[in-house]
């Protein structure tokens, strides 16, 4: 019955979408949005009256709402009115999760990335893992808010997460502890001719730690710097400005494109300190504040990016209540680089793309190896 219901929801949304497009394209007359709503109403009525099994109007409508938010981006979702009390109660309860950023694409929930230092990262939950179950409950087609709620719970408890690892074509089950955690600190590794700095997440102390590494590089007469931002996700975008300032000096770091919400641009206010060659390592788990940092250094410090495309999470989201009592959690703004590149959505493509494989280990790190090669050869960044 659940399978039939899933197919039914898919058919309702798909038929409504196709019919809406047909109505929009047909001749003059009504406003396209009015036409689309009229067609949707007709499809809804026809489905209720003619589908082989009795249908629940609430189920049909909630499926349509989920389809609508899925069409926006992987991070937006709708919470129905009947679930808002439980949703608010969980938010206010102090519930914690295992440190997984979750999104939905094509109706399937997946791991964007584990948060740095989290139980999920320690248990090697990987970006791109599909989530099919939480504590034995099938959540393959569940809306995003239900998955997030299922992952969270009282601090100190555990949660079992069923994953499908696409790159290895296998199912993986992990038991994760729900706990508060501290992101790991910035790491510095020195070589004879360059310095490698790993930035796990941007915090209030990141700029100071970066400044110390830059000052030490000056004392060692090193003018090549590799910044490893792979897996750097989460944190506060306000902490990006002091760090980016060290590389770009005064001026714009990012602005926010939004239709309705007035948001201030991000500006660097200090002096540029580092003037050597900079290489940035990125992957699919480089997201949010880290993407803003990478884009600013690409545009204004001629930094070269090496690795894979970033997460596309440089966005601003808001919970917007609806008149029916539900709420839309949706993207209301996207960060834009100084040159005008939109960061939220597709993510940033690297200047030097590196293909990676599941068997890659710390002893064979193709992205780092290529980054060191670029830094040492002085390969100039290709135009975007």
Where are these regions (language model features)?
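An acidic helix/loop motif centered on a single conserved Asp/Glu
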Residues: 55-72
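Hydrophobic membrane-insertion alpha-helices, especially the h-region
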Residues: 7-22
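Cleft-lining beta-strand/loop regions that shape enzyme active-site pockets
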Residues: 25-36, 48-52, 56-57, 110-113, ...
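Short acidic, Pro/Gly- and aromatic-enriched capping/linker segments at domain boundaries
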Residues: 322-334, 349
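Conserved functional hotspot residues or short segments at active or partner-binding sites
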Residues: 343-346, 360-384
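PDZ/PDZ-like peptide-tail recognition elements
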Residues: 63, 74-113
